A protein has these predicted regions:
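Cytoplasmic helix-loop-helix junction between adjacent transmembrane helices
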Residues: 107-143
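C-terminal transmembrane helical hairpin of 12-TM major facilitator-type secondary transporters
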Residues: 263-266, 270-323
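C-terminal ends and interior cores of transmembrane alpha-helices
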Residues: 84-98, 293-305
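Extracytoplasmic gate region of multi-pass secondary transporters
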Residues: 26, 30-37, 218-274
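Hydrophobic core of transmembrane alpha-helices in multi-pass small-molecule transporters
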Residues: 20, 101-117, 229, 309-323
Length: 323
């Protein structure tokens, strides 16, 4: 483990930070403002959900083509593009205007640059440059996302509860501006790092570059596809409507913020379990395990209203996110 952290510590910092700041485009953060956004635009839960779903689907389709850039341009350039994109999206939220098309564009940018491109950059970088330790490296990057899950809702709901939504998004913009210089500090020596990676491609079949058409023709792709989309599909729905769900069950927003601390903790537990499992048994033997905690969390949410089960739900949900 010591050799792992000393191999390329700056790149690990990059993976952690870029996935952490991608949190601003994640459903768990955006949904904290669900009520304010709906009130501002006069939308029902279903109408805002429709706008959010279309924006997310559109961003995912565009990402399929856009994400290829990371294979063809310098990682520093790619990272700067996607980070500035998220910065503009946060500024757009801070300057929100009452136009439904404007809302669609801003949600699209948050989802595309945050949830999509920045997370993709962090995870791809970890998997690419750490070879047989890619599982542990991916855990470090994912830990950045878990830190966002743990602290951003807690801070927002406990310390900024009386601050207007637009002002909070302005603060988010400032934090991204502060983050941008760290991209270049963490990615110093990137040219030499990538040259070393290219040299190892011939001897490492795990790093084989595949075209999209090759993946689509592979039967294993269609076996793993349901497993890959089930967890995020269900999780996004739960997160997006979390304010409504908690209100319906009589759970306060402060409880939600505190619950995220527990969610983040068990996400880390899941990471500590999942990373070594991937390195030892590989993905094909561990993929199915991610659905177990999620299934249990949904059952708990469906059957129980006690505050005690709120924390059971958040714990199981966090374990699912980590694994």
């Amino acid at each position: 483990m010591k050799n792992f952290f000393s191999y390329d510590p700056k790149l690990l910092v990059y993976g952690f930070l870029i996935v952490f700041f991608a949190s601003y485009g994640q459903t768990f953060f955006i949904s904290l403002f669900n009520t304010e956004i709906r009130f501002y635009y006069g939308l029902t839960d279903g109408e805002f959900g429709f706008v959010y779903a279309i924006s997310t689907l559109f961003s995912s389709f565009i990402l399929i083509s856009f994400a290829k850039l990371i294979d063809h341009i310098d990682l520093r350039t790619y990272s700067l593009i996607v980070t500035v994109g998220l910065l503009l999206a946060c500024i757009g939220m801070a300057l929100l205007i009452n136009n439904i098309f404007y809302l669609f564009i801003i949600i699209f940018m948050l989802r595309f640059f945050g949830q999509g491109a920045m997370t993709h950059a962090g995870e791809t970088t970890m998997a690419r440059y750490f070879g047989s330790n890619r599982g542990k490296a991916l855990s470090v990057a994912t830990l950045g996302g878990m830190a966002g899950v743990m602290f951003l809702p807690y801070i927002s709901l406990n310390y900024f509860i009386n601050i207007e939504m637009k002002q909070l998004w302005f603060y988010a913009s400032i934090s991204i501006i502060v983050f941008i210089p760290f991209i270049f500090l963490a990615l110093s020596g990137q040219k030499a790092r990538h040259n070393k990676f290219d040299q190892g491609l011939i001897n490492d079949p795990l790093n084989l570059k595949l075209r999209t058409r090759d993946i689509i023709k592979d039967k294993k792709f269609y076996i793993y596809l349901p497993l890959s989309i089930a967890a995020p599909f269900i999780s996004t729905g739960l997160m997006f409507h979390q304010i409504y769900i908690f209100s319906h069950k009589g759970w306060s927003l402060e409880m939600l913020g505190n619950g995220y601390i527990l969610l983040g903790f068990f996400s880390i537990v899941g990471l500590l379990i999942g990373g070594p499992l991937i390195d030892k048994f590989h993905t094909k033997k561990t993929a199915i395990t991610v659905l177990g905690p999620l299934l249990l969390s949904v059952i708990v949410l469906l059957l129980f209203d006690s505050v005690f089960f709120l924390f059971i739900y958040m714990s199981l949900y966090g374990l699912n996110m980590g694994i």
